[in-house]
Curated annotation (Swiss-Prot):
Protein name (Swiss-Prot/TrEMBL): NAD(P)H-quinone oxidoreductase subunit 4L, chloroplastic
UniProt keyword annotation of Lipid biosynthesis present: no
Keywords: Chloroplast, Membrane, NAD, NADP, Plastid, Plastoquinone, Quinone, Thylakoid, Translocase, Transmembrane, Transmembrane helix, Transport
Catalytic activity: a plastoquinone + NADH + (n+1) H(+)(in) = a plastoquinol + NAD(+) + n H(+)(out); a plastoquinone + NADPH + (n+1) H(+)(in) = a plastoquinol + NADP(+) + n H(+)(out)
Transmembrane segments: 1-21, 29-49, 63-83
InterPro entries linked to this entry: NADH_UbQ_OxRdtase_chain4L/K, NUOK/Mnh_C1-like
Record bears the keyword Oxidoreductase: no
Source organism phylogeny: Eukaryota, Viridiplantae, Streptophyta, Embryophyta, Tracheophyta
Main location: plastid
Organism this protein belongs to: Cycas taitungensis (Prince sago)
GO molecular function: oxidoreductase activity, acting on NAD(P)H, quinone or similar compound as acceptor; quinone binding
Membrane topology recorded in Swiss-Prot or TrEMBL: Multi-pass membrane protein
Top-rank EC class of the record's enzyme: translocase
Function: NDH shuttles electrons from NAD(P)H:plastoquinone, via FMN and iron-sulfur (Fe-S) centers, to quinones in the photosynthetic chain and possibly in a chloroplast respiratory chain. The immediate electron acceptor for the enzyme in this species is believed to be plastoquinone. Couples the redox reaction to proton translocation, and thus conserves the redox energy in a proton gradient.
NCBIfam families recorded: PRK05715.1-2 (NF004320), PRK05715.1-4 (NF004322), PRK05715.1-5 (NF004323)
């Protein structure tokens, strides 16, 4: 069970990193960042259940990471919406925010 959860967490993390590196769209990059944070949550819960199933430290950390991910998504989408209103594009390679 431990191996399967860690392998799935590693796959999620790898897909998120690959998408974050290769994506040119800001919304897609935010989605890949969320995928990375979900992979971290999978690993936290897996290690928490494997090492000491009586304590819920990994589960509590997972809740905190989820809350931070929700705040990051809200702020990131608000920034993407503001940039889209000004630039009419969400492509990362077209951003030149020094001349806003």
């Amino acid at each position: 069970m431990l191996e399967h959860a860690l392998i799935s967490g590693a796959y999620l993390f790898s897909i998120g990193i690959y998408g974050l590196i290769t994506s040119r769209n800001m919304v897609r990059a935010l989605m890949c960042l969320e995928l990375i944070l979900n992979a971290v949550n999978v690993n936290l819960v897996t290690f928490s259940n494997y090492f000491d199933s009586r304590q819920v430290k990994g589960d509590i950390f997972s809740i905190f990471v989820t809350a931070i991910a929700a705040a990051e998504a809200a702020i990131g989408l608000a920034i993407a919406l503001a940039i889209y209103r000004n630039r009419k594009s969400t492509r990362i390679d077209q951003f030149n925010l020094s001349k806003w």
